[in-house]
From Swiss-Prot:
Subunit record text: Part of the 30S ribosomal subunit. Contacts protein S5. The interaction surface between S4 and S5 is involved in control of translational fidelity.
Record-linked NCBIfam families: PRK05327.1, rpsD_bact
InterPro entries, per the entry: Ribosomal_uS4 (IPR022801), Ribosomal_uS4_bac-type (IPR005709), Ribosomal_uS4_CS (IPR018079), Ribosomal_uS4_N (IPR001912), S4_RNA-bd (IPR002942), S4_RNA-bd_sf (IPR036986)
One of the GO BP terms on file: ribosomal small subunit biogenesis
Keyword Plastid: yes
A Pfam entry, by short name: S4
Gene name of the encoded protein: rps4
Protein name per UniProt: Small ribosomal subunit protein uS4c
Amino acid sequence: MSRYRGPRLKKIRRLGALPGLTRKTPKSGSNLKKKFNSGKKEQYRIRLQEKQKLRFHYGLTERQLLRYVHIAGKAKRSTGQVLLQLLEMRLDNIIFRLGMASTIPGARQLVNHRHILVNGRIVNIPSFRCKPRDIITTKDNQRSKGLVQNSIASSDPGKLPKHLTIDTVEYKGLVNKILDRKWVGLKINELLVVEY
């Protein structure tokens, strides 16, 4: 299954708020939400919706998500927490959480177009796994800095998670530590995703 490129607001109406997918919000009084919420929810449907939330928020394919669940299952700690830590430590998500891009697909595009450096080296793989003490910067040219400058100016510094710090003057971000569960930017029950 390929990455979703269709209408984003339809997914938000169906699954709820997905801040990584888009900044847009649906109009209130939507008939679509009422249509899908009527009646009793089945257990399978609840699990499927939680999995789809995770997939669409982080912009993953089905195969990528299964691979992350498999890696998290091998860990000795809680599978759900390890899964969220793996997804939150992806380079495209770190750039989004630092405020260098307005959405995760926008952050993925910055990485693919080689505007981002990790520890002084160009990285063009959005799924690159960041580690504590990694320094994320932009290229030293005006075009790269201009792309990031607009996003940083419009982002809210109060929403920056505790495991990240950013220097808005030099457009430099630092990963301080591994993420805690309470700082995940998405309301989700990760155990239902693992059970699915």
